[in-house]
Amino acid sequence: MMTKLDPYFGEYGGMFVPQILMPALKQLEAAFVDAQNDPSFQAEFTDLLKNYAGRPTALTLTRNLSPNPLVKIYLKREDLLHGGAHKTNQVLGQALLAKRMGKKEIIAETGAGQHGVATALACALLGLKCKVYMGAKDVERQSPNVFRMRLMGAEVIPVTSGSATLKDACNEAMRDWSASYDKAHYLLGTAAGPHPFPTIVREFQRMIGEETKAQILEREGRLPDAVIACVGGGSNAIGMFADFIDEPSVKLIGVEPAGLGIDTPKHGAPLKHGKTGIFFGMKAPLMQDKEGQIEESYSISAGLDFPSVGPQHAHLAATGRATYESATDDEALAAFQLLARSEGIIPALESAHALAYAIKLAEAATEETLLVVNLSGRGDKDIFTVADILEKQQANNEESGNE
């Protein structure tokens, strides 16, 4: 089937969906290409980003975070965006696109709840009906975001099938869309899934890297040595990387969740430890067992708890243009606390994975180095999770001290 845009990134990507969804994907691709070439669409999108969401976001030089005087660590402050994370960028773009296509209803999936909140706010703003699928486990661990979504008029549907996490919410959302695409738009939350979603999401997130490039040149007079972002599905990372891909002097570093350790079954690092397979409408690295069944991914952060990754990240890894590392729960937790104590900024646990790796890089540096970390979201949603963990750790320490 002919497409207007290339559905593949190297060998990854594609449109592996039931035939019934092909017309919906074709319609979406055509509408996207048309909108990208329409100055009035771009003007409305830019206006919403500026006057509703609060772009451009700040680029903050940390004062106390870097463990090495040779290393400057800047934070791209997507946590300051309306809605609390980078998710708002592309949600506004897709919601405008849905209205342009005459859709009345939005279907979405969410893990940490940030994409759900962003979708709910865009639907409230633009007068669209909103339905959000969320794994039952995530509904429990992200109750503040569930309340926010419902407050803004969204219907939140807990998904109890499978592992009751993000991948199951994705499956249910896709199932719903296949029965209702004539009136509904599936507002996918990450740079993954069938074509044209990975391309649409990248283009509606690329202002992260564009702003970063302009801001760092203004502040430092040069490009950074590396840009670092956490990777679940990969939307915040591809938004940061997109404008730097053609700058060979800039290292692109994605940080996957190592969970309890890469050598344990409890992690979410398909790029480093997955096998290529077909999942969620795309060909991409995937966490699979010996029989080829999809393994449950694991991370302390609900937003990184995804067993696959966007196809462009897979291609960037395969070609060597980007490198993908990992950070454990404990490392992310330490970085979460360190940023709060050293800079007065509470990051999302997702973003804390990228911070953890940046701190490692800084410790090892032997020459002047300029790092930019994409602080993809704020940590309000995670404070109860972190409080519980720290309380348990303290209780364990006290117990071992009494033995």
From Swiss-Prot:
Recorded metabolic or biological pathway in which this protein acts: Amino-acid biosynthesis; L-tryptophan biosynthesis; L-tryptophan from chorismate: step 5/5
Modified residues (N6-(pyridoxal phosphate)lysine): K87
GO CC, one annotated term: cytoplasm
Alphabetized InterPro entries for the sequence: Trp_synth_b_CS, Trp_synth_beta, Trp_synth_beta/beta-like, TrpB-like_PALP, TrpB-like_PALP_sf
Keyword terms: Amino-acid biosynthesis, Aromatic amino acid biosynthesis, Lyase, Pyridoxal phosphate, Tryptophan biosynthesis
Catalytic reactions of this protein: (1S,2R)-1-C-(indol-3-yl)glycerol 3-phosphate + L-serine = D-glyceraldehyde 3-phosphate + L-tryptophan + H2O
Domain of life of the organism encoding this protein: Bacteria
Cofactor: pyridoxal 5'-phosphate
EC code(s) of this entry: 4.2.1.20
Single GO MF descriptor: tryptophan synthase activity
Enzyme class: lyase
Coiled-coil segments: none
Quaternary structure annotation from Swiss-Prot or TrEMBL: Tetramer of two alpha and two beta chains.
Role according to the record: The beta subunit is responsible for the synthesis of L-tryptophan from indole and L-serine.
Family: Belongs to the TrpB family.
Name of the molecule in the record: Tryptophan synthase beta chain
Organism lineage string: Bacteria, Pseudomonadati, Pseudomonadota, Gammaproteobacteria, Alteromonadales
